[in-house]
Amino acid sequence: MATIKKSININAPVEKVFEYGTPEILPEIWPSLIEVKNIKELPNGGYSWDWVYKMAGMRFNGSSEHTEVVPNERTVSLSTGGIESTITWEYQPVDDGTKFTITTEYKVPIPLLGKLAESFIVKMNENEQEVVLANMKAMMET
């Protein structure tokens, strides 16, 4: 399993950032997430959805579900299918707005390519997570 944890400060209130973080907006902020569909609300206040993701030139289909939702604090989603992962979005109030943190734990879905390819994919995904954070910041501050 690979783990990536990155944060950014956003000049917007926690409530606004949390409310925006729904599956519908994911393709707007996540460049490799090609499609999100079949979004359904869950009794825990979260969602389930299907997705299409492109990594290292390969296309993956899967499903995600919020397994934990603490309003204005955190969401945890579990993804199955093409890429198995757990993604936690944390929202922490800070003086100038919100500290937004994404922690992604995932299984690199290309075992046959070995450690070199895995290192490349992990680095690529670290860069992608920085882009997601920057895009969320841009959407919230405009």
Regions picked out by a protein language model, each given a short descriptive name:
Residues 14, 46, 73-74, 88, ...:
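Structural motif
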Residues 28, 38-83, 131-142:
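Glycine-rich portal/gate segments that line the openings of hydrophobic small-molecule binding cavities
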Residues 4-6, 47-51, 62-64, 87, ...:
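Hydrophobic residues positioned within well-ordered beta-strands of beta-sheet architectures
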Residues 7-11, 65, 90-92:
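Generic structural detector for well-ordered beta-strands
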